[in-house]
Amino acid sequence: MRLFRFCRQPLRGLVILIEQFPAFLRLSWVCMAASLLGGAVSERYIWLGSITDLLARGVFAVAWLRLVGLGEMPGRAAYFRLGRREIFTALGWMSAEIFVIFPAQVIAASLAIATGQPFADLVMPLLAIAHALLGAAYLLPTEAALEVGSNARWRLPEMVMKGGVAAGLAVFLAWLPTNLLLEGVKALPVVDLLEGLTLGQMAAVPVRYLGVALTAGAMALVWNALTAEAE
């Protein structure tokens, strides 16, 4: 069925992540260090910490999207390139996360108030549904990262219409293992390792970057498939 035509892309993205794990470490370690630094200062300077983490994830998302989608392989041992593409991709990734997550949280909070059930029990299934139905929003940062040439035309509306829920299901399948890992991280004991950082916060950073790699890899493959369909 065409609804499930992109369900193999998350698995292919996982295989690429496993095969290119040394490249993942090379592309992500500086970005993860920046995110950890942002987390450490966020208690005192919340905006500085949030912006640092946002831009760091944008830098890595561009690198991984272009590695999977275009075959680009930066050769440096440490990678951190911040330019127009990375800023737009970071903003697009944040917008996609808000577009997908915020409605699920609002509905879960409303249901928790109305029914008396715990918010945590309600939000997980709603987040799963939201990723499946609205996950095509991640085509926004994908296009920002994969644009080629100065005359590249804006194809996002066309790609969202063609991808639809099929692209959202790919996002859901890529999001699911990361979410399960983050739930495990939440169960870690609260131990202060550094000033402003607990064990759980430090463990969550590499898990989130794995999640970015899985989602970005799946969406790069979906974008290439949609581009091939359009030609």
Feature locations, PLM:
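Hydrophobic alpha-helical membrane segments
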Residues: 1-231
